[in-house]
């Protein structure tokens, strides 16, 4: 995961200090891209331990189209609690936009079902896109989408994915996003009969919060280790049929967790 360490180093050396919505302050750069070959191992950070359970359940929650944290809490995942209202609702966030984008004529568009179908029918299409950024709904969301658009690409029997992330909390959020979209790419590849290719991560405002700088410097002192392997149950043939038990992360040997506060 040298790509991630290079990003940390670039922000620490070149970042501009900026004010932000949370009042915490950031060091920020604009425009950065990382590429991960999924055949070379699953891109899960090894220089600090990440919670696989939270990553997988959040992705399954998105794919269910849910926008209430009830499912997450039932599975011991609290990463969205800070933004939920008293009833656990978040407004029309990722799951709603992915699975039930409201069309002007009253229809509901299932972008995930559509893109999986299109990969099978028209793999060379340049329209294999899912967007979570709906300007009509942004003001209704507890937190507008940070990872807001992704595109699939098929070549030589392999499925690749590029994510555009408008706002990237590099210490806490980006490691989750890398693993989540790498896993999504593997899942979609399996159900469309393809092999995983690359995950390409394009960042807009990539920032370290000022209260994460010491943690980032600590992480950079740790040598990277071999990437783990992600095994997915080959019997699952629908993108909506995956369960937590269908994923097995093997040979994950990370350095210890590094605690940092979430900027809300």
Curated annotation (Swiss-Prot):
Gene Ontology terms: biological process: dTMP biosynthetic process; dTTP biosynthetic process; methylation
Q: How does it assemble?
A: Homodimer.
- Residues bound to dUMP are 21, 126-127, 166-169, 177, 207-209
Subcellular location field: Cytoplasm
Q: What is its main location?
A: cytoplasm
Q: What is this protein called?
A: Thymidylate synthase
UniProtKB keywords: Cytoplasm, Methyltransferase, Nucleotide biosynthesis, Transferase
Question: Which regions form coiled coils?
Answer: none
Q: Where are the active-site residues found?
A: 146 (nucleophile)
GO CC terms on record?
Answer: cytosol
Q: Name one GO molecular function term.
A: thymidylate synthase activity
> In which residues is (6R)-5,10-methylene-5,6,7,8-tetrahydrofolate bound?
169, 263
Q: Which reaction does it catalyse?
A: dUMP + (6R)-5,10-methylene-5,6,7,8-tetrahydrofolate = 7,8-dihydrofolate + dTMP
UniProt organism field: Nitrobacter hamburgensis (strain DSM 10229 / NCIMB 13809 / X14)
> What gene name is listed for this protein?
thyA
């Amino acid at each position: 995961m040298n790509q991630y360490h290079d990003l940390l180093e670039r922000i620490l050396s070149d970042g501009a200090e900026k004010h932000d919505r949370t009042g915490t302050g950031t060091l920020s750069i604009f425009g950065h891209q990382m590429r991960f070959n999924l055949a070379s191992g699953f891109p899960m950070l090894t220089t600090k331990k990440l919670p696989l359970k939270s990553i997988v359940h959040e992705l399954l929650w998105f794919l269910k189209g849910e926008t209430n944290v009830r499912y997450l809490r039932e599975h011991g995942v609290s990463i969205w609690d800070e933004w939920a209202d008293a009833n656990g609702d978040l407004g029309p966030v990722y799951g709603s936009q992915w699975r039930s984008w409201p069309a002007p004529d009253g229809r509901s568009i299932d972008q995930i079902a559509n893109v999986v179908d299109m990969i099978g029918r028209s793999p060379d299409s340049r329209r294999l896109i899912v967007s979570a950024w709906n300007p009509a709904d942004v003001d209704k969301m507890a937190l507008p989408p940070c990872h807001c658009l992704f595109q699939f690409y098929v070549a030589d029997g392999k499925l690749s994915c590029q994510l555009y992330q408008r706002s990237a909390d590099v210490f806490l959020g980006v490691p989750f996003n890398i693993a989540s979209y790498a896993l999504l790419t593997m899942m979609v590849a399996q159900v469309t009969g393809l092999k995983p290719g690359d995950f390409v991560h394009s960042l807009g405002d990539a920032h370290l919060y000022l209260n994460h700088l010491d943690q980032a410097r600590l992480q950079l002192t740790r040598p990277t280790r071999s990437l783990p392997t992600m095994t997915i149950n080959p019997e699952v043939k629908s993108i909506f049929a995956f369960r937590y038990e269908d994923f097995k992360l093997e040979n994950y040997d990370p350095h210890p967790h590094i605690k940092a506060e979430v900027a809300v």
